[in-house]
Every structure is written in structure tokens, then in C-alpha cells.
């Protein structure tokens, strides 16, 4: 038997009786801490730091009877410089690969200017995430447990616009948006095009009302600031505002509280201070479309 404690958003993967508390877990023979963590439901890309008996450990550590294991997600505001991490930050700028069930989220990421690919096959999602160091986004926990995935995130929300806010917050992207530069259908960067080149493809009256047009080299769609443009601008601004107003769930354990509607997540206690306490000894010891 070993005692486990999961912090922050990692509790989202656990049965309710194991959330935000220490609990005993029976070991089924020799197992790495990675296997033990995933057996409890937490996919390895969501884990950033593991502490065993007060000392940092990596995924290969073999769990022993009597071990005290603390598992942490990535933190945005806790300085862990010099401490061993099992997670790594994705290369910048962040690029994504999404499974087919997140089609609407993928379109919103492209709208905001982010490189986001959409694939139908889970094996292809995992392979592309591994070879191109893209962040795999999915609602399928099992997909994130595939060994080859290094960077991945399980989308908690079910509403596409809230999913978009969630991704902006998790990867600190609210101020890195570059809207209306990618094709929302195929992800290709758009290029300016002269109106005379696409005039025959435009609805009547469009040429007289708009002066700037862009074409997608990938699928040949044409874009201009049509009737939906202002609504999309508001959508992006609302998302940025929500990120700034919403508490960062990576900085505190979260608990879900039932409301009249979908559950929401709110901070429960300071995981930052718990994280620093855990490491105090360890650090001293080791140093044709329209927008």
C-alpha cells in the first residue's frame, strides 16, 4: 500500500472520495509511479511534478509499500526553478492537434490565429503530437494515456466557447491571439488577394461594400469582413476578458459545486503553499467564406 495525494486540476480525474485528500492505494505488484498514477485515472501529460517521500521523482520510480506520493499539475505562478519536472513545456509558439470531437474548438483556435489540426483517427492524433511536438487536445482520457504523447490536455468543458476560454487560460494565450489570419476550414495561412481575381466568386454587392479580401492557398476559399465579422470580434474579446477575470485553476485545488446548470470550478485552497512546503527539504538538499 502507498499513500497518494493529487493537487489542483488532477483531482478532476479521480473518484470523488479521493479528491483533495490523502488516500491509500493498493499496489498490484511492482509498478512505476507513472503506471500507478494512470491506473488511478490521471493521464501522464497532465502531470508536471512528482514527489515521493519528500524527494522529486520521475516517471520510472518504482513505488514501494509505505511510500508517500504527491502529484502536481503544471503551475503558472509557483516558481519551481531548479526542481525536477516530469513534464515539459511545449515549444513556442504552441501548436495543437485535436481529435474530431473538438471540431468547433478547432475552428475557434484557427479563428484566433493558432495552428490547430483536426484528425479523425486517435492513433494519428498521438503520432502527430509526438512527431511535431503539438499539444494534443481531447475529451478522451484514454487518448492522453498513450505512451508517445508528451504534450496533452484533457478538455474539461463541453461548450465550445468555454473550451476556447479554457485553452487560452491553460496555455497563457489570451494576449497572443492574431485573429483572421488562418483558414477556419483547413488551417492554412491566408494571403491577400485582389478583388478582380475573385470578383466572379463574390455574392452580388460584396465588391461594392468591401475592399479587402483574402484567399486560402490550401482550399481556395475567399474571406472578407462580412456580416459575422463584428460578432466574431466580440467573441474573441469576450474570451480574453473571461480569461482575465477567471481564477487560474492551475494555482489552486478545484472542487466542483453544483449549480442550476453545468458545474463550475472554483479555488478551494492554496496549493502553492502546499507545493512549497513539500519541496522545502528537497530544495535544501539538491539545489468561400466570410468572417
Could you say what each language-model-derived stretch is?
Residues 1-95:
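Ubiquitin-like/PB1-type beta-grasp interaction modules and other compact soluble beta-rich domains
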Residues 242-291:
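Intrinsic disorder/low-complexity segments
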Residues 120-145:
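BRCT (BRCA1 C-terminal) domain core and associated BRCT-interaction motifs
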Residues 89-119:
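Short, charged N-terminal beta->alpha structural module
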